[in-house]
Amino acid sequence: MPLSDAMPALLVLADGTAYRGWSFGATGTTIGEVVFNTGMTGYQEVLTDPSYRGQIVVFTYPELGNTGVNPEDEESARPQVRGAIARNICHKPSNWRSTQSLPDYLKQHHIPGIFGIDTRALTRKIRMYGAMNGGISTEILDEAELLEQVQAAPNMAGLNLVREVTTSTVYEWSDPTTAVWEFNPDGTVKNGESLTVVALDFGVKRNILRRLASYGCRVIVVPADTSPEEILKYNPDGIFLSNGPGDPSAVTEGITTAKALLESEKPIFGICMGHQILGHALGAETFKLKFGHRGLNQPAGLTQRVEITSQNHSFAIDPDSLPEAVVEISHLNLNDRTVAGLRHKSLPIFSVQYHPEASPGPHDADYLFAQFVHQMRTTKQATTAEVS
């Protein structure tokens, strides 16, 4: 599309900074927290990841939409972002899997975007001053008028956005990672009886469910406000706490449930929001990072093993608040030394701040799914032996 045919658009940040560009996707006005993602690939997975609910995403890679979109790469049923910001947009994608252009896809789902702005300068600003609310509009092109709406919007801290993305009904997930994309999980973990995992849905990504299914798990997904009693009625071999959006300290229903589930002594595995929820259940606190971690190359580790990980989060666990007698740090983010993993000292319970399913991203941490399966099998065998 020639720029002469593009509709003008305006981006205004909460501090009054304004950027003028052109519209792609839907027209209208949208307001959310402006954050940046440094990944070179996986824009469709980012746009449809429920963890981005309430946010406007700046893509730092200068080209966006070159490979179009397709139904298989969606992490949920629709885009979850409030808006998208890009340097350049491709209106005519070229890829054998593409079924639709990115602008048409966002227009279909009523998601506004702006392109043609200096995304490098915008990213540096967020990095220096922190993530902040912003607004994109094709209707309001007066900076002061749009700024007024942006400043009236609530901040991310204190928001429970899980209620907007969790499932409303219980369902069972059985689809594994598609064979053409399978990257050889440890086949030994599939041997034996199928394991039942109840996944508490705070905004779960489909590829996490696929990895659990690939490792031989029967996955039952339940709403975030499901009581511990209802969860335990399924007699699960393990419990999974999923990723999700917003402030973890505001998800009081999840924290209360996780705290009760700890008493069951069943294996528990948490990812991202689930990691933070578990931290709260164990007595820790979380805090908001200046601009968060969003990208595909975050190093994490503690000993001599380092994993390159995919991350997407605004909050982190305060290490000084962890009860040292109960839990230990298993991983640190090696860029800023924030907590990236927890492990219970006596129970089969662990969590990571990053995404081991890595869709997109490196597969360094896929072993964590095998570790979860191993803990479930070991616990099940020990329980069976005690009964017999």
Swiss-Prot record:
Active-site residues per Swiss-Prot or TrEMBL entry: C272, H355, E357
EC number: 6.3.5.5
Any one GO BP annotation for this protein: 'de novo' UMP biosynthetic process
Keyword S-adenosyl-L-methionine: no
SUPFAM superfamilies cross-referenced by the UniProt entry: Carbamoyl phosphate synthetase, small subunit N-terminal domain, Class I glutamine amidotransferase-like
Catalytic activity: hydrogencarbonate + L-glutamine + 2 ATP + H2O = carbamoyl phosphate + L-glutamate + 2 ADP + phosphate + 2 H(+)
CDD domains tied to this protein: GATase1_CPSase
Region ranges (CPSase): 1-192
UniProt pathway: Amino-acid biosynthesis; L-arginine biosynthesis; carbamoyl phosphate from bicarbonate: step 1/1; Pyrimidine metabolism; UMP biosynthesis via de novo pathway; (S)-dihydroorotate from bicarbonate: step 1/3
Role: Small subunit of the glutamine-dependent carbamoyl phosphate synthetase (CPSase). CPSase catalyzes the formation of carbamoyl phosphate from the ammonia moiety of glutamine, carbonate, and phosphate donated by ATP, constituting the first step of 2 biosynthetic pathways, one leading to arginine and/or urea and the other to pyrimidine nucleotides. The small subunit (glutamine amidotransferase) binds and cleaves glutamine to supply the large subunit with the substrate ammonia.
Quaternary structure, from the entry: Composed of two chains; the small (or glutamine) chain promotes the hydrolysis of glutamine to ammonia, which is used by the large (or ammonia) chain to synthesize carbamoyl phosphate. Tetramer of heterodimers (alpha,beta)4.
Family: Belongs to the CarA family.
Protein name from the UniProt record: Carbamoyl phosphate synthase small chain
Organism: Nostoc sp. (strain PCC 7120 / SAG 25.82 / UTEX 2576)
Gene coding for it: carA
